[in-house]
Amino acid sequence: MKNIRNFSIIAHIDHGKSTLADRFIQYCGGLDLREMSTQVLDSMDIEKERGITIKAQTAALNYKARDGQVYQLNLIDTPGHVDFSYEVSRSLSACEGALLVVDASQGVEAQTVANCYTAIDLGVEVVPVLNKIDLPAADPERVEQEIEDIIGIDAVGAVQCSAKSGIGVEDVLEEIVAKIPAPTGDENAPLQAVIVDSWFDNYVGVVMLIRVKNGTIKLKDKVRFMSTKAETQVEQLGVFTPKSVQKQELKAGEVGFLITGVKELGQAKVGDTVTLVANPATEPLPGFQEVQSQVFAGLYPVESHDYEALRDALEKLQLNDASLKFEPEVSQALGFGFRCGFLGLLHLEIVQERLEREFDMDLITTAPTVVYEVVLKSGEKIEVENPSKLPDIGSIETILEPIITATILVPQEYVGNVMTLCNQKRGVQVNMQYMGRQVMLTYDLPMNEVVMDFFDKLKSTSRGYASLDYHFKEFQPSDLIKLDIMVNGEKVDALSLIVHRQSAVHRGRELASKMRELIPRQMFDIAVQAAIGSQIIARENVKALRKNVLAKCYGGDITRKKKLLEKQKAGKRRMKQVGNVEIPQSAFLAILQVSDK
């Protein structure tokens, strides 16, 4: 056991984490050259394209160190994006050490800081590594100083490498052996193994990635999941080198995969503890949480007969992504669809993209919303995640909205812009800290405002330099009202929004004028109105298309012309009574582009 090292790599998006992992695998001979593809551990196409890691992957590598001993290095790849922070904390809890990979030309970013604090809280040894030192813009001394200022760990003499060209990779491996402690644990104690990740395989069902903390797990053992109390039998055990290699047993300190007869991911929850039925552990390992959805959106098929296909597709995605929640919902405007819950906006985009790409679906997505707590006058408390389900204003005592604490790292010259943006979004400043050339701002922001377009705005006001990390803080009472959009006198439920009273009139006007541009002209006039309760706050008209009925009357009597015009008007009126308006997908997305000046 003293020759095992479990470690993961913490890095901001694009700081070279996956490339470094590829180099480790190549250096330790995990795959031969023929099987090396770039970003071996990022197995989904969408992960490679966006250059982000979503699911945790793993590789067990044998490394012959300079002291002549062979070490087993277990690399657990972690996602770097803020939406997947729970997956990160699970990956880190399975390790004794973490490599903090920082781009030597860009310096420290907010998500790196957040994940690094998570690691330090979990008692994981953090080893700084400077990557991309072969870039002309690299400035290792400055970045070492930044790591010390911002994160507060000793970074002088941090290992320098370039994962792309392979310089210094061996030094990094030596550093892992030297700095990261060997796992502790008792092979003879009752079994305790934490599920780091789980995914669905079409042939064997659910594959779980586990880290054995205490005890030993063997083939054909009967095991129990401690949070759901489900029991099942071990069918296969093994490790990934990234290819899967079968083993007879996994002992304390090892990381490997476990396949049982479980067919649903809901039973193998990430962070849960696995133990033996025959000799169970009394306590589960700490840190398990049920994943909560933060952002909700409606997904509707463009063709209503694709509804069942969409259900199948969502169920298949859920097999691989336990944090995706969905339930059927009916909208008058869009027909049958699903209300889905996501971890954050990136998660929503990825699910939408996977549905379109892997399952060939055509979707309409409504604007994302968050969960509100509504206290009724009767004293009852309900949760509302869909604006059209908000009860009547008369029966509501207060509405509480979710507040998040956001940590923003930004270079000094953009601080003003970022603070202005946060104030526009009703943010409350909590803290501001100068660290070298960067400033760390902490704000309490309403999640509702962040969901819309905060991330894009933040990037554009800071020219892409600001980085953001956030976590949920609490629910707070707020002056919120429901804004309805009416087309031709009918409410379109899918366009309802819950907004703050201050920005309601402005938002209503903007939305109405946006809709006027997007709804195609019909044969009759269409009124687009924004309403709060029964009060109309904005109106726009989409002008009718009309044929020139006077074209055939060269000269002639005015009464003849009047007669034709009156006849046309009467026809248009009749049309308006029976006509219905098709609202295009772009109109639903318009909600997202409305700014809050």
UniProtKB/Swiss-Prot annotation:
InterPro entries: EF-4, EFG_III/V, EFG_V-like, EFTu-like_2, G_TR_CS, LepA_C_sf, LepA_CTD, LepA_IV. Its EC number is 3.6.5.n1. Keywords: Cell inner membrane, Cell membrane, GTP-binding, Hydrolase, Membrane, Nucleotide-binding, Protein biosynthesis. The keyword Ion transport does not apply. GO terms for cellular component: plasma membrane. GO terms for biological process: positive regulation of translation. It is a peripheral membrane protein. Pfam families: EFG_C, GTP_EFTU, GTP_EFTU_D2, LepA_C. It catalyses: GTP + H2O = GDP + phosphate + H(+). It is found in: Cell inner membrane. Its main location: membrane. One of its GO terms (molecular function) is ribosome binding. The keyword Secreted does not apply. GTP binds at residues 14-19, 131-134. Belongs to the TRAFAC class translation factor GTPase superfamily. Classic translation factor GTPase family. LepA subfamily. Required for accurate and efficient protein synthesis under certain stress conditions. May act as a fidelity factor of the translation reaction, by catalyzing a one-codon backward translocation of tRNAs on improperly translocated ribosomes. Back-translocation proceeds from a post-translocation (POST) complex to a pre-translocation (PRE) complex, thus giving elongation factor G a second chance to translocate the tRNAs correctly. Binds to ribosomes in a GTP-dependent manner. This is Elongation factor 4.
